[in-house]
Amino acid sequence: MESQQLSNYPHISHGSACASVTSKEVHTNQDPLDVSASKIQEYDKASTKANSQQTTTPASSAVPENLHHASPQPASVPPPQNGPYPQQCMMTQNQANPSGWSFYGHPSMIPYTPYQMSPMYFPPGPQSQFPQYPSSVGTPLSTPSPESGNTFTDSSSADSDMTSTKKYVRPPPMLTSPNDFPNWVKTYIKFLQNSNLGGIIPTVNGKPVPPMLTSPNDFPNWVKTYIKFLQNSNLGGIIPTVNGKPVRQITDDELTFLYNTFQIFAPSQFLPTWVKDILSVDYTDIMKILSKSIEKMQSDTQEANDIVTLANLQYNGSTPADAFETKVTNIIDRLNNNGIHINNKVACQLIMRGLSGEYKFLRYTRHRHLNMTVAELFLDIHAIYEEQQGSRNSKPNYRRNPSDEKNDSRSYTNTTKPKVIARNPQKTNNSKSKTARAHNVSTSNNSPSTDNDSISKSTTEPIQLNNKHDLHLRPETY
């Protein structure tokens, strides 16, 4: 029947039947789809006449242009203007290929799916860098491709795209066993070096820093080493500060590096529970883990400082008792809130050990009271402090004149010390020697004078000598 129908169209050769569907040489108004080979032979002549007399759309507009039809005489057809599919509704080639791949003429020409890479190795772009993926995603590098005879390692196109241009570096193989992890880390470090990231891998004795986390209890110390590792990698600006905010905003590449290094050096089975809780919500939120770790380190430092302060308390009344009580109670409350419980007995012993001065006797008056509380101890401290303040206020504030104190000191010395005869100030002007003085005395005794009579009057009276020769004799010496 197909041969009979084709004989009705003298302009169409049997070899170019497919090309005639879109050819401009079709002069009939009959739809070629109505006379296809799928039609049965029961069509009569009446139905054929009815179909031929109908005013239908030209055959060229009913079938869209097929650019890839294997026709020996391809013919170009202008886009339809009045067919059932308007021109503005037809898909363009770019719309049909949103991924931007080259258009393949035959399904057999489409290549197989490329090597499945871990999401952390995706090239930079608008796509998500951290999609969730199961552990089964990805294949080892040794796995052959779907096409026989071609493997990923032997693909020249892959080598030219990934290794020769250095735009994308071949990722390390998939880790399949915990026992292979040491060797896999070496491969990963080699991958970083090939990615021009070898300068950010500090080493100590040939081993990468930070060390591997091997226990949840070692996580606080490991985080300190990891933060030092980031600082050595010129990433100190993204580390959260005391207020929990970094100095600068982290970039996507830095976040990728942060995620990869944390995942390598801190295996999930060795993470503490609170770290796992954060990763269960967002497994890429490494910044939150660092922020919480810094807060815990500060809290641990504060706890150590509080314990040292409480063990070395000293009080002698030089500061107000209220300030001393506030300081001690705040330290005890902080330690109790952080899980370090200080009971009343221990607290009272630490407080009483630091008391001195008038407060020292509290060690002995209260030592028998086993149920004494910190509040009761501070009641006694307040009582002593108020008594000290009252005694200081009752003392007179009069200050003696310095001149009065000077006069009192003079009179005191005159009454206690024996009176000393002062020498004549003219002594310094007398330059006579002792021999000359003796000669004068002897001559004065031989010569008659009234002074000799006064000397010989009585031996019991004190001897009085003129002060002519500056001689002074004490009566008790004779």
Swiss-Prot record:
Keyword Protein biosynthesis: no
Region of interest: Disordered: 1-84, 126-174, 390-478
Keywords associated with the record: Cytoplasm, RNA-binding, Transposable element
Annotated Gene Ontology cellular component terms: cytoplasm
Biased composition (Polar residues): 1-10, 48-60, 127-152, 457-466
GO molecular function: RNA binding
Intrachain disulfide bonds: none
Keyword Ribonucleoprotein: no
Entry text on domains: The C-terminal RNA-binding region of CA is sufficient for all its nucleocapsid-like chaperone activities.
Subunit field text: Homotrimer.
Cited function: Capsid protein (CA) is the structural component of the virus-like particle (VLP), forming the shell that encapsulates the retrotransposons dimeric RNA genome. The particles are assembled from trimer-clustered units and there are holes in the capsid shells that allow for the diffusion of macromolecules. CA also has nucleocapsid-like chaperone activity, promoting primer tRNA(i)-Met annealing to the multipartite primer-binding site (PBS), dimerization of Ty1 RNA and initiation of reverse transcription.
Name of this protein: Transposon Ty1-H Gag polyprotein
Gene source species: Saccharomyces cerevisiae (strain ATCC 204508 / S288c) (Baker's yeast)
